[in-house]
A protein has these predicted regions:
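Residue-level detector of the transmembrane beta-barrel scaffold of outer-membrane proteins
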Residues: 1, 34, 42-44, 57, ...
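Flexible, solvent-exposed coil segments and beta strand-coil junctions
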Residues: 6-14, 64-74, 120-129, 175-185
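Gram-negative outer-membrane beta-barrel transporters
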Residues: 108-112, 116, 127-201
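Membrane-embedded beta-barrel scaffold of Gram-negative outer-membrane proteins
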Residues: 36, 44, 48, 52-54, ...
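Residue-level signature of outer-membrane beta-barrel architecture
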Residues: 25, 35-36, 49, 83, ...
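Outer-membrane beta-barrel proteins
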Residues: 2-7, 52-58, 68, 112-118, ...
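Membrane-spanning beta-strands of outer-membrane beta-barrel proteins
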Residues: 24-26, 74, 84-86, 138-140, ...
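Signature of Gram-negative outer-membrane beta-barrel scaffolds
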Residues: 1-38, 64, 71
Length: 201
């Protein structure tokens, strides 16, 4: 009972039990629109919400709620984490260059909410530990250019993506680790570890 994350519920029977995680429901609206411009061009727009389940370790790590006697040595899973939510906007234009060949240029922007983070909690005897939570935010924006060619039985395509990805933490334990090293949290957007500026396919 000395661990604030290990609170037992006491129903009328006075039999202690761990509270159950609450079920979560997500609604994912998506919308797409395409408008033909003449005989050789199409303008398109799309909007959508996408969800991704947290990794299993962040839900069930250290499920026995055992805390090491040293500060910043323990990180616990959290069964009530929210799903990572991405809101995507995209607008693009496809243009036929000549019969069988086309060029598409698209701009996109993504807001990424509920990124995994680590909240710092103190036990009653002032031991600091981490609990996974949904505190971080990121976004991605960029440009995609695609050339497609189809002639007879042969088809090919080339794709180039320019992308900038930023967030307020590079990994779920960044703030926790910095606090353990007596460093202040990052107070600005920084490039994410999965930021890939140029991609050719």
């Amino acid at each position: 009972r000395r661990n604030p994350a290990n609170q037992l519920s006491l129903p009328d029977s006075m039999t202690s039990a761990y509270p159950n995680a609450k079920p979560q429901t997500q609604i994912s609206p998506r919308f797409g629109l395409a408008y033909q411009l003449g005989d050789a061009a199409v303008l398109h727009f799309s909007y959508g919400h996408f969800f991704q389940m947290p990794p299993m370790y962040s839900l069930f790590q250290n499920h026995s709620f055992l805390i090491a006697p040293n500060d910043y040595s323990t990180v616990m899973g959290n069964a009530e984490l929210k799903a990572e939510k991405t809101v995507t906007y995209e607008i693009g234009l496809w243009q036929q260059l000549f019969p069988g060949a086309g060029l598409e240029v698209s701009l996109f922007y993504r807001d990424i909410y509920n990124l995994l983070s680590t909240r710092i909690i103190s036990t009653y005897n002032q031991i600091e530990y981490g609990l996974y939570s949904n505190k971080d935010y990121g976004n991605a924006r960029g440009l995609e250019i695609k050339f497609d060619l189809a002639t007879g039985p042969i088809s090919a395509w080339l794709n180039y993506t320019l992308q900038y990805t930023r967030g307020n933490a590079d990994n779920p334990q960044q703030t926790f680790s910095r606090s353990g090293a007596s460093m202040d949290p990052v107070n600005r957007f920084i490039p994410m570890s999965w930021d890939q500026r140029h991609t050719f396919n």
